[in-house]
């Protein structure tokens, strides 16, 4: 999509006046002025020249699309959904034309500058072709059986093909982890491992219908559990190895480092975070999962395609060091927040009235966690003579940025800056999309267009991008040096919703990093890579923080809480809603002191006592108690598991009936027990109040009348 007419933007902007007479020097960061040059037109890049993206958007879209599709089918999906998922994956990973697997290989090879050995490449591609053909045959048989599940032959065929295909995955996975080639083969390994785990899930879902014995189903399930651990640990190990190998000292090395971090998150880590949710014993119904990690797109800065003019590329223009860039643009672990307002402060790089560039020089961001207080941060120069530009994004998802990287060139000294950005946004719950822009004018400078969708494409291409976008803008960093001002955008996945809504008919996973505040002693720390985001930690007793949750009716629905945690000590977890205690239980240590966090150190265990919410919006709090200081307790996420409504309603009614009856003597049903106190009657009244109107409305009214009678007797007795 092309940027709109610059003149149109200038006429619309109230801050479009260009300061042509500015005299401040670069030292106070108000103007950047450099001497003229005779061959400036020769060196200058063409107007609106598009930067060739480091990777084709379609390459990344494959990873984003598969993860997005799986997010919609977690738990135990319908048979038709599973067949549809396989059809989608086959189309993405084994399309007609050039092999997607080869594209994955070439992409990682280019980032890390390491070619895969010819033998390893050919062996992997050959095994992938075989797996693709076998998966297509299984998919066809699965669809035939789904259409006629009572057909004995169709059932026998799909069962036999399933067993053969699963064994084939066991045999072929090592081809994607050849010694010395683990890093360049990592996206292939992750996608193949993901398919194997999805396939193993089928035995738990369909095995009984296919005629598999209980022992056979158990074998497949146990293999799924073991392989989930092994595949996760392999992916995290080699992701970290590849990333550490790219760590450098200058800005150019940071570019490759960040590209690897971003693309491997999209193609590998996002899938790994979903692996545990394939477990049908733990997630037997529809499950809602969320990715809270952040990815950082390429810095907005000109990149000259001709090596003769490499000095005009931003990272060669005396840019900050690797560590300085990391510190400036990569956020410290924090609670998930949403961008609400950006105030932009501008600088002016000017040689003449026909060659100048107003550019982004600094900014103030306002962000807010779900239900929390406003947080403000600033970067760069905020003390300039040019009027600031303020853009509002409250309750809006910025799903795309189109940015102009500008180059103002004089003699041998280039100036890299950002003269213009279009922010495309949408209200998440409404069919309303528009854009805000930053633009104060420029002339006679070279520009390159950088479109965020080249790096973070929509999940699908069949819908408008404002409907199928995969990420939202969450933060903006600034790489700042004497002649460089380059923006770095931070993005969160769309699955991390704004509401923390708990559904009555599905398991809801809410990462604890979505809390709106941190308790004293609690900290947000980097996630280990397989959690889909950062996690919270305590080293002494106390609460972690509060989560604002929204409840979809019916309120009669009851839930059980589960916690995915890791701990170096035995402890107690306590939970409460709106300050009222609901659960307390003992939990075991999962790891030893000094041990690294890996897949096996985390467990998902819950409380047995169910509870219900009484308000549409509530505050959920969790704390860790009864352990010695110096230990470490980590929480990844909280899970709300719905309990069958009708069964729970019946149980609650029987319990309330017993409590009401217990107020009176057994010999005289109308006689109140002498030891009944006022607070006893109030407790019973609250219990009756919590009964379901949907299932026991008449009985509830009758019990209320009895409680009122007990209250009346108690008052008369005291008088």
From Swiss-Prot:
Single annotated GO MF:
toxin activity
**Would I find Isomerase among this entry's keywords?**
no
Could you provide one GO biological process annotation from this protein's UniProt record?
Answer: symbiont-mediated killing of host cell
The UniProt keywords, alphabetically, are:
Sporulation, Toxin, Virulence
Family in the record: Belongs to the delta endotoxin family.
Report further notes: Toxic segment of the protein is located in the N-terminus.
Could you tell me what this protein does? Answer: Promotes colloidosmotic lysis by binding to the midgut epithelial cells of certain coleopteran and lepidopteran species. Active on Plutella xylostella but not on Bombyx mori.
What protein does this entry describe?
Answer: Pesticidal crystal protein Cry1Ib
UniProt organism field: Bacillus thuringiensis subsp. entomocidus
Organism lineage string = Bacteria, Bacillati, Bacillota, Bacilli, Bacillales
* Gene it is expressed from: cry1Ib
